[in-house]
């Protein structure tokens, strides 16, 4: 923090960020490059993720829709809050 202002890279720890986005739309990218978009229902300490209204995207193309999806944490590259 410089001069009382947050700079990029500073801020909340990942646990509080994930807690705040529960119930919001997120994008989850897997190590394989596959992307899931959906409403974040839960995430645990191992980064296991439960999504509702999930969509699977491969190479920029929507492939499937799921009512619920569970993603094992060791496959997750990142989770991003959707704008």
From Swiss-Prot:
It holds the Pfam family LSM. It comes from the Eukaryota. InterPro entries: Lsm6/sSmF (IPR016487), LSM_dom_sf (IPR010920), Sm (IPR047575), Sm_dom_euk/arc (IPR001163). One of its GO terms (molecular function) is RNA binding. GO terms for cellular component: Lsm1-7-Pat1 complex; nucleolus; P-body; sno(s)RNA-containing ribonucleoprotein complex; spliceosomal complex; U4/U6 x U5 tri-snRNP complex; U6 snRNP. One of its GO terms (biological process) is maturation of SSU-rRNA. PROSITE patterns: SM (PS52002). It is found in: Cytoplasm; Nucleus. The keyword Electron transport does not apply. Keywords: Cytoplasm, mRNA processing, mRNA splicing, Nucleus, Ribonucleoprotein, RNA-binding, rRNA processing, Spliceosome, tRNA processing. Residues 13-83 form the Sm domain. Coiled coil: none annotated. Component of LSm protein complexes, which are involved in RNA processing and may function in a chaperone-like manner, facilitating the efficient association of RNA processing factors with their substrates. Component of the cytoplasmic LSM1-LSM7 complex, which is thought to be involved in mRNA degradation by activating the decapping step in the 5'-to-3' mRNA decay pathway. Component of the nuclear LSM2-LSM8 complex, which is involved in splicing of nuclear mRNAs. Belongs to the snRNP Sm proteins family. SmF/LSm6 subfamily. Component of the heptameric LSM1-LSM7 complex, which consists of LSM1, LSM2, LSM3, LSM4, LSM5, LSM6 and LSM7. Component of the heptameric LSM2-LSM8 complex, which consists of LSM2, LSM3, LSM4, LSM5, LSM6, LSM7 and LSM8. The LSm subunits form a seven-membered ring structure with a doughnut shape. PANTHER family: SMALL NUCLEAR RIBONUCLEOPROTEIN F SNRNP-F, U6 SNRNA-ASSOCIATED SM-LIKE PROTEIN LSM6. This is U6 snRNA-associated Sm-like protein LSm6.
């Amino acid at each position: 923090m410089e001069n009382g202002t947050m700079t990029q890279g500073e801020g909340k720890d990942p646990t509080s960020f994930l807690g705040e986005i529960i119930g919001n739309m997120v994008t989850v990218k897997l190590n394989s490059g596959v992307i899931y978009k959906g409403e974040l229902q839960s995430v645990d300490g191992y980064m296991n993720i439960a999504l509702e209204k999930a969509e699977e995207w491969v190479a920029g193309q929507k492939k499937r829709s799921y009512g619920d999806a569970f993603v094992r944490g060791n496959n997750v590259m990142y989770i991003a809050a959707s704008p």
